[in-house]
Amino acid sequence: MAYRKLGRTSSQRKAMLRDLTTDLLINESIVTSEARAKEIRNTVEKMITLGKRGDLHACGQAAAFVRNVIASADYDEATDKYTSATALHKLFSEIAPLYADRTVRYTRILKTEPRRGDAAPMAIIELV
């Protein structure tokens, strides 16, 4: 096959890719194994491209993949309520406008020292 199986069944692999993609969109940088970083790079690129398109269909496609997780919660003293933004909202309102002039490669993979314990090659994947 043309893709990495990452030692998981297809459903486990898809769930892991969704989780890592959502985490990267929320935190803008994560530490993971090198193989996982190379694999989620493709999905993150697709999500940011959908965010740049910005239409309703692109929003629906991104919502089908990105987890519905709260990215940030801010307290509004005037209304005495918390306002929260999901990962999908952050993708379309904060991340996509940053890459309006860029066409490809929205992520960067930096190799780090091997993981302690099993010496797996580790990497930091971050949004450029």
Curated annotation (Swiss-Prot):
UniProtKB keywords: Ribonucleoprotein, Ribosomal protein
Pfam families: Ribosomal_L17 (PF01196)
One GO term describing the cellular component: cytosolic large ribosomal subunit
Family of this protein: Belongs to the bacterial ribosomal protein bL17 family.
Superkingdom field: Bacteria
HAMAP family: Ribosomal_bL17
Keyword Ribosomal protein: yes
InterPro entries from the UniProt entry: Ribosomal_bL17, Ribosomal_bL17_sf
Self-association state and partner proteins as the record states: Part of the 50S ribosomal subunit. Contacts protein L32.
Coiled coil: none
Gene3D superfamilies, alphabetized: Ribosomal protein L17
Lineage, broadest ranks: Bacteria, Bacillati, Bacillota, Bacilli, Lactobacillales
Species the sequence originates in: Streptococcus suis (strain 98HAH33)
Gene Ontology molecular functions: structural constituent of ribosome
GO biological process: translation
UniProt signal peptide: none
Protein name in the entry: Large ribosomal subunit protein bL17
